[in-house]
């Protein structure tokens, strides 16, 4: 998405002026983009033309559209599975669509890796840094805006409701929202209401703020999109990218019983040698 938003591509980069920008300055709105006619700039100072599409962005668009199609098909099958759990055809379809969409995801992510690889034909550290810095800017930007939104909604001041963030995700503490709505201890009802709150209130707000970001930076396209991934009642973080969530809803699929989402943490770890129980000499 960052490649598409800033039109990052080997043939569209037209300048590099790191003294003009930084993530912090752009977050404060201190970078003047008024003179950037048909140009945009990433927070590391890489400048890209926006009067014609780059081949890399067009390629990413194709793969992203393809991935979205198969991911939607997978979610449809997952919803069916909640009503017909023993159906092997549904299980096979879920595996098939998941494999296809994951293959597209890997291909999408590999574009950044290729640009940052000195053995790649299109290696350019300015573009690789541009993607990284733009990602930091986008996440920190929306983290601020979501905190502002929830503080305003809950009539609080300077409370950090975003408890963690990743390269393309934020994790929001919604307990105070649940209390304000007076939802009580019915977890399934709470999950249902939060699902609607995210879709009808939070997501439109995020879309609006990301459009403001795109307008500010004179982006080629507004491609920053955030969708609700999971709703969980408990979570444990040991470090960045290392967490466990007790999930009741995953991408719109409601679970009868919660499932653990484990990321970056060993579910089973052996720190010593296990002796064989049957040893023949």
Please place each PLM-identified region on the residue numbering.
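Conserved small/polar residues in nucleotide/adenosyl-binding loops
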Residues: 271-277
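Catalytic palm subdomain of template-directed nucleic-acid polymerases
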Residues: 171-197
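Catalytic palm active-site di-aspartate
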Residues: 67, 159-175
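Phosphate/diphosphate-binding loops
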Residues: 200-212
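Polar, glycine-rich mid-to-C-terminal structural blocks
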Residues: 245-264
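Helical catalytic core of nucleic-acid polymerases
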Residues: 1-145, 149, 153
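Short, glycine/acidic-rich hinge or "gate" loops at secondary-structure transitions
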Residues: 80-85, 150-166, 212-224
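Short, conserved secondary-structure transition motifs
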Residues: 224-239
